[in-house]
Curated annotation (Swiss-Prot):
Gene3D superfamilies: 3.40.1350.10. HAMAP family: UPF0102. PANTHER family: UPF0102 PROTEIN YRAN. InterPro entries: Restrct_endonuc-II-like, tRNA_endonuc-like_dom_sf, UPF0102_YraN-like. This is UPF0102 protein cgR_1859. Belongs to the UPF0102 family. One of its GO terms (molecular function) is nucleic acid binding. It comes from Corynebacterium glutamicum (strain R). It comes from the Bacteria. The lineage of its organism: Bacteria, Bacillati, Actinomycetota, Actinomycetes, Mycobacteriales.
Length: 122
């Protein structure tokens, strides 16, 4: 049985995925787990760039998603991405963080996408 936190996380991943699909991206993989770390979403942009996406979903007030993805988390994401990329042809990559905050009154998601967080979010 899924926990409330797992349902919230899955909902956030669905919302984040739709954001990328609306921008013509293609889903390559989802919820990839290795002993060194996990990857929430892996998408290929129309430009060909493969994006490893970390999704952070919260209820209520805004939160600092940059603090939620610290150096340790980035290291785990990089290691997992390297494993996922093994044996695949070279492709440009980037790491994004999608912060989703659900409005406490309406339940509507507010979405902020931080692109290329490894090189300073844009």
């Amino acid at each position: 049985m899924k926990t409330q936190k797992q349902y919230l996380g899955a909902f956030g991943e669905d919302v984040a995925l739709q954001q990328y699909l609306d921008d013509q991206a293609t889903l390559l993989d989802r919820n990839v787990r290795y002993s060194c770390g996990e990857l929430d979403l892996i998408v290929r942009l129309a430009s060909g760039v493969v994006v490893f996406v970390e999704v952070k979903t919260r209820r209520g007030s805004a939160f600092d998603s940059a603090a939620a993805v610290n150096n340790q988390k980035m290291l785990r994401m990089r290691r997992a991405a390297a494993l996922w990329l093994e044996g695949k042809p070279y492709t440009p990559i980037r790491f994004d963080v999608v912060a989703i905050v659900l409005d406490p009154h309406t339940g509507r998601p507010g979405i902020t996408v931080y692109e290329d967080v490894e090189h300073g979010a844009r």
